Swiss-Prot record:
Protein's name in the database: Progesterone receptor
Biological source species: Chlorocebus aethiops
CDD domains, per the entry: NR_DBD_GR_PR, NR_LBD_PR
Region (Mediates transcriptional transrepression): 165-305
Compositional bias segments (type: Low complexity): 335-350, 434-454
InterPro entries listed in its UniProt record: NHR-like_dom_sf, Nucl_hrmn_rcpt_lig-bd, Nuclear_hormone_rcpt_NR3, Nuclear_hrmn_rcpt, Progest_rcpt, Znf_hrmn_rcpt, Znf_NHR/GATA
PTM annotation (Phosphoserine): residues: 20, 130, 162, 190, 213, 294, 345, 400, 676
Segments for region (Disordered): 1-256, 332-380, 415-454
Positions annotated to bind progesterone: 766
Entry superkingdom: Eukaryota
Gene behind this protein: PGR
Region forming the signal peptide: none
Length: 933
């Protein structure tokens, strides 16, 4: 086979004369102890006499004995086609060579002997033979400095040699076959490519079976524009680099791409002549040097071989900082390897690299990724929109305890995220810059899609944390140091996908969404997100952010501009108190016609239309609803029964902020219109006054007291009284404010469920007011004392009903409290499935509960006493459920046996009993209790 040759000179040599292959042999240093140095020992060291050293022989190589120098064109062709065979032949001849077996020729043999003596190990038995002179054809730094198996055995004198007198990465026997070596300055691999050098345990010479290394090694191949070597090595040089991690780790079973040796050698694109500016590694000079490394390797490795494609300087800066700050790369790893980094190092975990910045084959993806202590490290973050502070904050924060803040920020600006242990490792994400494909292995992609904790960590890296000041200008926000996703402000809608399908699709979506003020999305981005964000950022100013329709609406009137008399319906000037409410003439006529005409108005909106002086005619349904809520009833004409002076003073009390002094006889009425600073000012008469005005008149039973009482006559008289009271309940409920807003079916249902409770409650109130609870005052013509109760057939039932007036006497219930409790009894039982107008029903019930509290406050002073009073009254309402159930059962039994008992039941009462009492007794209704039993 032909031998690997270097190309023509790119710069004039330093010898001062034309290069000639016959000048001499270069000074070859003693190779660093190989991985199998212990297998071959030598008891004695060769004695070499002093020889003169030729400078030309030191700097320029020459061909082997008996070999003619080749022309430059032939050398270029052989250098490309024999990359695989060069390293294999060098390994095949190692077992036959020795330190003194080379035939001396001119200065070459003597110089090699001198170097063998100078660079011999210090301990006995550590001498190692060198390969034959003419077999190793590589004049390049193919594998970098070799690490000896025993680091202390490395020669100490090797570090003091001049960089030009030592071969940083060549083998020890490279004395011939390198005629063109003087044309190219020997150089080592860049620090970023040292990560993939073969381990120290891998074979280097022949005689040992070659094993594929877990990571492919990198071979630099020079490419010259217009050279004829493109025909044979075109795919290796012009094509995109390929990751060989999967093939190399497979034990050699997988197919190896062209240009890769059995040991996993991968081709690395050579630097272009247009980019020759070196980049010096300043920190590596102070870092401890790995055992077996030469000073030349440290110097030449600082030159970064820039590819032809345009570079992203931000990513290069981040990568350089990574390589310079990690001293573990050059510190040595003992018998393991100094160039294959341990699993816990950042270099072993952060393998993916963007195409166009570094060759992909130099950073193959890890086939078996594992978590380590460097979570936020690597090249998985896109370098777009980054600055120096962000680079430090996103990468160095995970490697060192230092915290990198935004320029001008202090630690107090990040109170929510104290420095702590690094968050869990996010999986490697594919590069997201436009025009770049994701270069990841299948196992790595699978680990990305199966990781559930990656979303939270990647999210905190890409998005600004809540509480952190936003980055101004076109820069991206600083990374979030929160351990979880809960600490970030923006939602997950715009998060990029980290699944394997997204990696195979190509470019990922933009990782930095457009941000507006304080990190919020722009106005045209997402309205829902903006609204949610404003609630967190601008809570005191949300009232100012109203739609245009609401912004134009102002209060109808203020307290300062309140006229003496205004309409409580539309806000116009009031003409007087009509139907119990201070209204204008227009609303008065509207309410009268609506109630008398029995119109069924329907709102076209949501029953929340605005009713004012201008828009009061737009929606009659909402206008009528507002009239009923204000308390307008047709029975409001009963206000005429009051003294005219008293009514006028009541109206003045509504219009003026301070109550007007009135005579003592109207002190109770004045309390209803007296306002205190802690109470809500109401611009309409209290609801209690309306309840007083609609209270039914006295109803007579029509019982003939001249005849002796019989069971049938007494029960028949009570049924006739019940019929009349039922009609009175229907009329009263229709005049009740808010009751007409319910569905007509709900109105009927409530009356049928509560008519018995209302009648027995009214019985107790009349007994309490007229006879102080000593008798049962059914009607003025039907009053049962205890003697008549005993003579009746329902004495036990009379004793049950007698408990109510006795409770009234005990609690001294006022009329206002009784009226509010009576309304609550109407709203105290509903069907199990609920009402059709359930929402309106609950609002109505809540309003009357508040009225009961106000009625209690008229007499009780203090919060404690008012609370106790409210508990006592509501407890009485709850106890009525059990009492009324006994009445229902007796009434149903009497109705069933009416013919046998000769008891008459009126028509309406019969319908209600037959339709509803079986359901009530069967438990098909839901009683609304204030307290749990």
């Amino acid at each position: 086979m032909t031998e690997l040759k270097a190309k023509g000179p790119r710069a004039p040599h330093v010898a001062g004369g034309p290069p000639s292959p016959e000048v001499g042999s270069p000074l070859l240093x003693r190779p660093a102890a190989g991985p199998f140095q212990g297998s071959q020992t030598s008891d004695t060291l060769p004695e070499v006499p002093a020889i003169p050293i030729s400078l030309d022989g030191l700097l320029f190589p020459r061909p082997c004995q008996g070999q003619d120098p080749l022309d430059e064109k032939t050398q270029d062709q052989q250098s490309l086609t024999d990359v695989e065979g060069a390293y294999s032949r060098a390994e095949a001849t190692r077992g036959t060579g020795g330190s003194s077996s080379r035939p001396p020729e001119k200065d070459s043999g003597l110089l090699d002997s001198v170097l063998d003596t100078l660079l011999a190990p210090s301990g006995p038995g550590q001498s190692q033979p060198s390969p034959p002179a003419c077999e190793v054809t590589s004049s390049w730094c193919l594998f970098g400095p070799e690490l000896p198996e025993d680091p202390p055995a490395a020669p100490a004198t090797q570090r003091v040699l001049s960089p030009l007198m030592s071969r940083s990465g060549g083998k020890a026997g490279d004395s011939s076959g390198t005629a063109a070596a003087h044309k190219v300055l020997p150089r080592g691999l860049s620090p970023s490519r040292q990560l993939l050098l073969p381990a120290s345990g891998s074979p280097h010479w022949s005689g040992v079976p070659v094993k594929p290394s877990p990571q492919p090694t990198a071979v630099e191949v020079e490419e010259e524009d217009g050279s004829e070597s493109e025909d044979s090595a075109g795919p290796l040089l012009k094509g995109n680099p390929r990751a060989l991690g999967g093939a190399a780790a497979g034990g050699g079973a997988a197919a190896v791409p062209p240009g890769a040796a059995a040991g996993g050698v991968a081709l690395v694109p050579k630097e272009d002549s247009r980019f020759s500016a070196p980049r010096v590694a300043l920190v590596e000079q102070d870092a401890p040097m790995a055992p077996g490394r030469s000073p030349l390797a440290t110097t030449t490795m600082d030159f970064i071989h820039v590819p032809i494609r345009p570079l992203n300087h931000a990513l290069l800066a981040a990568r350089t900082r990574h390589l310079l700050e990690e001293e573990s790369y050059d510190g040595g790893a003992g018998a393991a390897s100094a160039f294959a980094p341990p699993r816990s190092s950042p270099s072993a975990s952060s393998t993916p690299v963007a195409v166009g910045d570094f060759p992909d084959c130099a950073y193959p993806p890890d086939a078996d990724p594992k978590d380590d202590a460097y979570p936020l490290y690597g090249d998985f973050q896109p370098p777009a929109l980054k600055i120096k502070e962000e680079e430090e904050g996103a990468e160095a924060s995970a490697r060192s305890p230092r915290s990198y803040l935004v320029a001008g920020a202090n630690p107090a600006a990040f109170p929510d995220f104290p420095l702590g242990p690094p968050p869990p490792l996010p999986p490697r994400a594919p590069p997201s810059r436009p025009g770049e494909a994701a270069v990841t292995a299948a196992p790595a992609s699978a680990s990305v899609s199966s990781s559930s904790s990656s979303g939270s960590t990647l999210e905190c890296i890409l998005y600004k944390a809540e509480g952190a000041p936003p980055q101004q200008g076109p820069f991206a926000p600083p990374p979030c140091k929160a351990p979880g996703a809960g600490g970030c402000l923006l939602p997950r809608d715009g998060l990029p996908s980290t699944s394997a399908s997204a990696a195979x699709a190509g470019a990922a979506p933009a990782l930095y969404p457009a941000l507006g003020l304080n990190g919020l999305p722009q106005l045209g981005y997402q309205a829902a997100v903006l609204k949610e964000g404003l609630q967190q950022v601008y809570p005191p100013y949300l009232n100012y952010l109203r739609p245009d329709s609401e912004a134009s609406q102002s209060p109808q009137y203020s307290f300062e501009s309140l006229p003496q008399k205004i309409c409580l319906i539309c806000g116009d000037e009031a003409s007087g108190c009509h139907y119990g409410v201070l209204t204008c003439g227009s609303c008065k006529v509207f309410f009268k016609r609506a109630m008398e005409g029995q119109h069924n108005y329907l709102c076209a909106g949501r029953n929340d239309c605005i009713v004012d002086k201008i828009r009061r005619k737009n929606c009659p349904a909402c206008r009528l609803r507002k009239c009923c809520q204000a308390g307008m009833v047709l029975g409001g004409r009963k206000f005429k029964k009051f003294n005219k002076v008293r009514v006028m003073r009541a109206l003045d009390a509504v219009a003026l902020p301070q109550p007007v002094g009135i005579p003592n006889e109207s002190q109770a009425l004045s309390q209803r219109f007296t306002f205190s600073p802690g109470q809500d000012i109401q611009f309409f008469p209290p609801l209690i006054n309306l309840l007083v005005s609609i209270e039914p008149d006295v109803i007579y039973a029509g019982h003939d007291n001249s005849k002796p009482d019989t069971s049938s006559s007494l029960l028949t008289s009570l049924n006739q009284l019940g019929e009349r009271q039922l009609l009175s309940v229907v009329k009263w409920s229709k005049s009740l404010p808010g009751f007409r807003n319910l569905h007509i079916d709900d109105q009927i249902t409530l009356i049928q469920y509560s008519w018995m409770s209302l009648m027995v409650f009214g019985l107790g109130w009349r007994s309490y007011k007229h006879v102080s609870g000593q008798m049962l005052y059914f009607a003025p013509d039907l009053i049962l004392n205890e003697q008549r109760m005993k003579e009746s057939s329902f004495y036990s039932l009379c004793l049950t009903m007698w408990q109510i007036p006795q409770e009234f006497v005990k609690l001294q219930v006022s009329q206002e409290e009784f009226l509010c409790m009576k309304v609550l009894l109407l709203l105290n039982t509903i069907p199990l499935e609920g009402l059709r107008s359930q929402t309106q029903f609950e609002e109505m019930r809540s309003s009357y509960i508040r009225e009961l509290i106000k009625a209690i406050g008229l007499r009780q002073k203090g919060v404690v006493s008012s609370s106790q009073r409210f508990y006592q009254l509501t407890k009485l309402l709850d106890n009525l459920h059990d009492l009324v159930k006994q009445l229902h059962l007796y009434c149903l039994n009497t109705f069933i046996q009416s013919r046998a008992l000769s008891v008459e039941f009126p028509e309406m009462m019969s319908e209600v009993i037959a339709a509803q009492l079986p359901k009530i007794l069967a438990g098909m209704v839901k009683p609304l209790l204030f307290h749990k039993k």
